[in-house]
From Swiss-Prot:
Name of the protein described by the UniProt record: Ataxin-1
Region (RNA-binding): 514-740
Post-translational modification: Ubiquitinated by UBE3A, leading to its degradation by the proteasome.
Family statement: Belongs to the ATXN1 family.
Ranges of biased composition (kind: Basic and acidic residues): 1-30
Bias (Polar residues): 218-235, 310-325, 360-386
Quaternary assembly: Homooligomer. Interacts with CIC. Interacts with ANP32A, PQBP1, UBQLN4, ATXN1L and USP7. Directly interacts with RBPJ; this interaction is disrupted in the presence of Notch intracellular domain. Competes with ATXN1L for RBPJ-binding. Found in a complex with CIC and ATXN1L.
Region (Interaction with USP7): 512-789
Length: 789
């Protein structure tokens, strides 16, 4: 055994080593495992041993192939006696590199000047963690310490990482990563027990780091893995929602690691720039203990989200790019572990939650994305040894189509509920814009809608809820689910959401590629379908606002509270007299006809003193307040059935009354709207000083529009006539040449004498519009009751 001093000296860069260069190779070979002699064979390592995927032994067992055996011996059974000394080609080297293991890692690229790899002794506690302060050889490799190396010595990931490309394209960085993966598995911080998780992929595809390739425009990818500080022996891994964020600087580079609830894997493009190892040595050692702790916490957690840019099977990785390197959305990367105690752990009831933030490289070609998409799948337990996919500890699949503008797709087990609707701050440590998407298949803990088992939430001032499937959905084809209309979609033009399998069952990875949605995701040119209006769904099943419901409380202008069914004509008149802002508008029913649509009637009103003719389509059950008679509707039976509101039959000659604002401008109401005081109130309510009345009015407008999709909105305003005030939302107003008259009607605000006459068509719904208590009375008349609600 070497002395501690010798070992520490060997860990130093060549320039600072005190050991004679000639003594190192023989001594090092002497101390290496008997299988070390096989390392020479590791040159051909993975390219020549595609079948070694499932044979590589873990840190606790013998190796299957000689090349892997040699690595195993170096990394598992001795104190990291073999390490890579990576320094720029121009840096002088005090130790002859060719004498150590000349055939193991010769410079693979003849055209690119890269320094050869040599071994250096590293301490047991050495743990490699990429840091933002350095790039190059240490960039882009997640140490097996964090990865929780599998029971088999050498993962197929290592094979694919180093052997996927031909020697002409494989950089020393790749060779370094493969060796590092094995070396990292041997060192464990004392006191931390680590149980070997299921086999996992190194997460690095062939040609990922090509020194000669230009860095992508978007260089940072973030994988945010959230887990609770539980033992590493967790039987099953939690589901992983995926979050996509377009910003590179979302996560700070300098973060500390510890047994926290969150781990962030940050990928930074090194651009093939290599720096001397000594400049990064201290940073690595300082993070060693933290990395060890993270491993215990994460164990299998990180593995499941680290399958990016890697082929699902070794053959696929080894077989492709034999003559050319494949561009990837992820170039050389840095690993940063970031604890966020305030993250999921505080919100998750189940204790362990995994989340993934992915920042795709916008420069990645769609062809490569297709390859990744086809290969980024989780292998089922039966194929775990054959495919180097990630395994969540339970059957299922997760596919990442990481195109430049693509929102993720993920699978969650129904047995592990995942909270929905969490704010963007739950996932991001910095004050960055909200995540683009949050996908969950949770069926219970849904705060937005109890019936949505799986949906996409786009956080923002008004969170956007996008249903993306149902619990029994077997295919991600339902990705193009209905999306609630929201202006936020303007900011997410290139987003395509695909649903995932919520079931806990084996998923055939091949089925994914066949789905039509996936090619679309790869292209990243698909826009989320946006429903034209929230009222559209309502159109199918129109419903009236609840204020017409019997028992709803209406507040009159004088402050008196009355039930909607107890309103009298005097209440309207008194409210108009007491209030300086309200007046009674009347509309006379001139004609009632059946509409071509079932359950809809066409009513023609003569509005105001000018008798402006307005035709309105209204639901037959919509109640109007008739002067001297009370509530009336075209179909009293339906009204009584729906609202339990006693109604009379609306007939020609009836004068419908409603309270409207006196100060409404002539042009404030649109075509046909002037006739409807309710619509006038609605418009005014928007600008009215009274929040309560405004709220009621808004409710009326929304309820009407949504309840009966028949109402058309023009420039955001309801088209139904004012007289119908209450029914306005349910009606579709057909404006006749009497528009000017309608405008005049607004001018009527002065003539209070006609209040009774005008009251024909104006429903009490207009009342809620006014901000004053009289407006509330109006609401009462219209049937809209805040108190009732």
């Amino acid at each position: 055994m070497k002395s501690n001093q010798e070992r520490s000296n060997e860990c130093l860069p060549p320039k600072k080593r005190e050991i004679p260069a000639t003594s190192r190779p023989s001594e090092e070979k002497a101390t290496a495992l008997p299988s070390d002699n096989h390392c020479v064979e590791g040159v051909a390592w993975l390219p020549s041993t595609p079948g070694s995927r499932g044979h590589g032994g873990g840190r606790h067992g013998p190796a299957g192939t000689s090349g892997e055996h040699g690595l195993q011996g170096m990394g598992l059974h001795k104190a990291l006696s073999a390490g890579l000394d990576y320094s720029p080609p121009s840096a002088p080297r005090s130790v002859p590199t060719a004498n150590t293991l000349p055939t193991v890692y010769p410079p693979p690229q003849s055209g690119t000047p890269v320094s050869p790899v040599q071994y250096a002794h590293l301490s047991h506690t050495f743990q490699f963690i990429g840091s933002s302060q350095y790039s190059g050889p240490y960039a882009g490799f997640i140490p097996s310490q964090l990865i929780s190396p599998p029971g088999n010595p050498v993962t197929s990931a290592v094979a694919s990482a180093a052997g996927a490309t031909t020697p002409s394209q494989r950089s020393q960085l790749e060779a370094y990563s493969t060796l590092l993966a094995n070396m990292g598995s041997l060192s464990q911080a004392p006191g931390h027990k680590v149980e070997p998780p299921p086999q996992q992929h190194l997460g690095r595809a062939a040609g990922l780091v090509n020194p000669g390739s230009p860095p992508p425009t978007q260089q940072n990818q973030y994988i945010h893995i959230s887990s609770s500080p539980q033992s590493s022996g967790r039987a099953t891994s939690p589901p992983i929602p995926v979050h996509l964020h377009p910003h590179q600087t979302m996560i700070p580079h300098t973060l500390t690691l510890g047994p926290s609830s969150q781990v962030v894997v940050q990928y930074s493009d090194a651009g093939g720039h290599f720096v001397p190892r000594e400049s990064t040595k201290k940073a690595e050692s300082s993070r060693l203990q933290q990395a060890m702790q993270a491993k215990e916490v994460l164990n299998g957690e990180m593995e499941k989200s680290r399958r990016y840019g890697a082929s699902s099977s070794v053959e696929l990785s080894l077989g492709k790019t034999s003559s050319k390197s494949v561009p990837h959305p992820y170039e050389s990367r840095h690993v940063v572990v970031h604890p966020s105690p305030a993250d999921y752990s505080s919100r998750d009831t189940s204790g362990v939650r995994g989340s993934v933030m992915v920042l795709p490289n916008s420069s990645t070609p769609s062809a490569d994305l297709e390859t990744q998409q086809a290969t980024h799948r989780e292998a089922s337990p039966s194929t775990l040894n054959d495919k180097s996919g990630l395994h969540l500890g339970k059957p299922g699949h997760r596919s990442y189509a990481l195109s430049p503008h693509t929102v993720i797709q993920t699978t969650h087990s129904a047995s592990e509920p995942l909270p929905v609707g969490l704010p963007a701050t739950a996932f991001y440590a910095g004050a960055q814009p909200p995540v683009i998407g949050y996908l969950s298949s949770q069926q219970q803990a849904i705060t937005y809608a109890g019936g949505l088992p799986q949906h996409l939430v786009i956080p923002g001032t008004q969170p956007l809820l996008i249903p993306v499937g149902s619990p029994d959905m077997d295919t991600p084809g339902a990705a193009s689910a209905i999306v609630t209309s929201s202006p936020q979609f303007a900011a997410v033009p290139h987003t395509f959401v695909t649903t995932a399998l919520p079931k806990s069952e084996n998923f055939n990875p091949e089925a994914l590629v066949t789905q039509a949605a996936y090619p679309a995701m790869v292209q990243a040119q698909i826009h989320l379908p946006v429903v034209q209006s929230v009222a559209s769904p309502a159109a199918a099943s129109p419903t009236l606002p609840p204020y017409f419901m019997k028992g709803s409380i209406i507040q009159l202008a004088n402050g008196e509270l009355k039930k909607v069914e107890d309103l009298k004509t005097e209440d309207f008149i008194q409210s108009a007299e007491i209030s300086n802002d309200l007046k009674i508008d009347s509309s006379t029913v001139e004609r009632i006809e059946d509409s071509h649509s079932p359950g809809v009637a066409v009513i023609q009103f003569a509005v105001g003193e000018h008798r402006a003719q307005v035709s309105v389509e209204v639901l037959v059950e919509y109640p109007f307040f008739v002067f001297g008679q009370g509530w009336s509707s075209c179909c009293p039976e339906r009204t009584s059935q729906l609202f339990d509101l006693p109604c009379s039959k609306l007939s020609v000659g009836d004068v419908c009354i409603s309270l409207t604002l006196k100060n409404l401008k002539n042009g404030s109401v649109k075509k046909g709207q002037p006739v409807d005081p309710a619509s006038a109130l609605l418009k005014h309510a928007k600008t009215d000083s009274l929040a309560g009345s405004r709220h009621r009015y808004a409710e009326q407008e929304n309820g009407i529009n949504q309840g009966s999709a028949q109402v058309l909105s023009e420039n955001g305003e309801l088209k139904f006539p004012e007289k119908i005030g209450l029914p306005a939302a349910p009606f579709l107003t057909k404006i006749e040449p009497s528009k000017p008259t309608a405008t005049r009607k607004r001018r009527w605000s002065a003539p209070e004498t006609r209040k009774l006459e005008k009251s024909e068509d104006e429903p009490p719904l207009t009342l809620p519009k006014p901000s004053l208590i009289p407006q509330e009375v109006k609401i009462c008349i219209e049937g809209r009751s805040n108190v009732g609600k």
